[in-house]
Amino acid sequence: MHLFISSVINKNRRLKKMFFSVPVPKNESVLSYAPGSSERDNLVRAIADLSKEIIEIPSIINGKEVFTGSTAYCIEPHNHQNKLAIYHKAGQKEIDLAIQSALAAHKEWENMPFYHRSAIFLKAAELLSTKYRFLLNAATMLGQSKNIHQAEIDSACELIDFWRYNTYYAQKIYEQQPLVSPKGEWNFTEYRSLEGFVFAITPFNFTSISGNLPSSPALMGNTVVWKPASTAVYSGYMIMKILQESGLPDGVINFIPGSGEEIGDIITNSPHLAGIHFTGSTKVFNHIWQCVGENIHIYKSYPRIVGETGGKNFIFAHSSADIKALAVACVRGAFEYQGQKCSAASRVYIPDNLYPEWLKEMKEILSTVTVGDVRDFSHFVNAVIDKNSFDRIKSYIESAQSSSEAEIIYGGSYDDSVGYFIEPTLIKTTNPHFTTMQEEIFGPVLTIYVYPSSKFEETLKICDSTSCYGLTGSIFAQDRQAIFLAYEMLRHSAGNFYINDKPTGAVVGQQPFGGGRASGTNDKAGSALNLQRWISARSIKETFVPAENYRYPFMD
């Protein structure tokens, strides 16, 4: 009898989802941090506090801190002699334990009413908006070398928006029920979590994505194993602590820093893998698909694979473009956060009649841009994330310098003696298929192709076919017919397409983010489209008065 009652209670918990409404979300306001403002003073204090000590970061498995003894350092990219933390890397034992913990926590978490799951993430948003705003911003600035504005729009505003909007979109999903229940029947849909656990693999470049990738599947009733980027463990650990303080039950999200290859290989060999939520390089994502494909016969269910990967994002100017607006978009789109945004502009197409004036405008703006430590708030550009990134970006600059098809027309300097600093660099090429027009660089490098203004349509075709990616892109024009032509011809060139604006800065609730082709599965983070990937619908029909005769009227 006890088991029967327990079963009924659990069933009712799952069905009793919509006797409430979550608060209607609004985008978190972006603070200015202007000189003399209280937020600026608070942030300066937070930076000073975090700079005082090197903290120790464990794995967090089933709510418990796990210190493995296999360690690495979190360093400041802008001053690589400064250590922020020492973190403990998960090995085979810890990875297996994280999987077991996620599986053990799954039933109770899935059965928790949606109201209570939502409340946890709404509380996390409130804590981040108030108590932890400046600490997480400071952690992102120091650990990932973001300037004050880039940290604010990322680790504060966007993550708060993810947590608030996700609960709202989830409610809208649960509200979707069959339109028809004929007389004597009741049709309804139950939205179940996936059977197994979800593996979240998060990047270094957006703290908000680090928080969203594990929490969005969790909101929908899934339990998660989370591997943060090794260069963003510092801010990731702080997010995990915020979620714990918000009431997240033990085992729902398990935080395991460590080797991506080792953790990934163990995870993809688990028969209980139900899904993967990924942001990172196309190369790594392809490897994940390959591993899943090779193991497809062992899984209990086909894993849901959701990924946002690389980009070779473009700005395309028509001869009717506003030159000042175009130049500002190029500087912000290409060089904010050192070009390390998935959406960053990396190639630009300029008509020959605009090029001289555009270049003059670019040089005037860039002459005022400074590069340096995040503690100096006057810098627009800071350091790239690590030595590997520095060397890779430098190799593209050196390749352009030695090529007969390209020339450096601005910048080109770099120095890693203190931090991993690379000057904003403009490369002009005569070949629209030049290497730096095709391959993702992920650094402060923008390549320009000057095209004959009479060949607008032909150059649009080149833009569409040059790169394997399809993430973001912009068209700059005042001529509406030109805008329409670009809109149509570049339909699959960008999952986020901007008209007279830079191709970066998607806002939750306004421009759901993601792209196709080699840029990912285009499941649009920050929207219901993404949340739907983390549920498995069950259609249920109840007949109140069942048929008592097998025969149909035509048989008489």
Regions found by a protein language model. Give the residues of each.
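ALDH superfamily catalytic-core signature
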Residues: I242-G247, N269-S270, G275, K283-P432, ...
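Short beta-alpha connecting loops at secondary-structure transitions
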Residues: K183, V224-K227, K312-F316, S343-R347, ...
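Conserved C-terminal structural/oligomerization subdomain of aldehyde/semialdehyde dehydrogenase
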Residues: N12-S21, E28, S32, H78-Y87, ...
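Glycine-rich loop-to-alpha-helix module at the N-terminal edge of alpha/beta enzyme cores
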Residues: T68-G69, Y73-E76, Q81-Y174, L460, ...
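Hydrophobic face of amphipathic alpha-helices that form TPR/SEL1-like repeat modules
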Residues: I9-L84
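Rossmann-like NAD(P) dinucleotide-binding subdomain of oxidoreductase/dehydrogenase enzymes
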Residues: M141, S145, A170-A325, N522
